[in-house]
Amino acid sequence: QVSSRGLGDVYKRQVKDEINITDKKAEPFIKQLNYHLDILSKFTDWMKEKIKNSPEDASGACNDYLKVLGLVATGHAWLKVLEVSFKEYDSNKDFYEDKIQTANFFFNRVLPRIESSYITATTGSNYIMNYKFN
């Protein structure tokens, strides 16, 4: 059984342990995912602290937290796709080139949204909870 204290670290370690692509072409993708895993880890620590001390802040951030978690998980899945794509590339170049291009789009256009979600969420809940409707 994993305590809630270490859950984010367990996931981060699992993802990093599974990233064992040796192809040099994968390095930019791995670097991107590691960077965003670190943001997820900071966000997880922030959420754990806010759940204890400021539940409204945690509530206000939960949607963004789930987005970040989902994007990191999708990046992890794309790395697995890339591992196969680089290995099998010569057997079906057109097919695997499409996979690599789609991964490139995801890692450069979609995954960076994590930063925005993290920054937005960690500003606190005042902008949500204290909004005055007219």
Spell out what each predicted region is.
Residues 14-134:
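C-terminal amphipathic alpha-helical interaction region
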